[in-house]
């Protein structure tokens, strides 16, 4: 196992959750969410995050249906990942993200009740869960 840093994204049409993680520890932490306008992020905000954290790899969550089929948002998330690669030249991996938002809400609620369930917090923790699940899958 290497010590690469990895940035995870929870794609959404209004907000994109972001987390940063380390392969060596297999852990991640949520960062601030990036606002999106109909799924289009402020690319300058993403550029700033990439320059600040210098990730070696990017992981984008794929919102699949429960039966594993794709939906419109899945196609848009894949397109977002492809654009990340095209704009910034970083390797992009995709990870099934079914139920991560539900898990993120439960985790935040346990910590702070309803007040902890701010949208940006949920998106960041969702990105954290996507990233940690990807690392677990890679290195078990």
Swiss-Prot record:
Keywords: Cytoplasm, Hydrolase, Nuclease, Ribosome biogenesis. GO terms for biological process: rRNA 5'-end processing. Coiled coil: none annotated. GO terms for cellular component: cytosol. SMART domains: YqgFc (SM00732). InterPro entries: RNaseH-like_sf, YqgF, YqgF/RNaseH-like_dom, YqgF/RNaseH-like_dom_sf. Could be a nuclease involved in processing of the 5'-end of pre-16S rRNA. PANTHER family: POLYNUCLEOTIDYL TRANSFERASE, RIBONUCLEASE H-LIKE SUPERFAMILY PROTEIN. This is Putative pre-16S rRNA nuclease. It comes from Aeromonas hydrophila subsp. hydrophila (strain ATCC 7966 / DSM 30187 / BCRC 13018 / CCUG 14551 / JCM 1027 / KCTC 2358 / NCIMB 9240 / NCTC 8049).
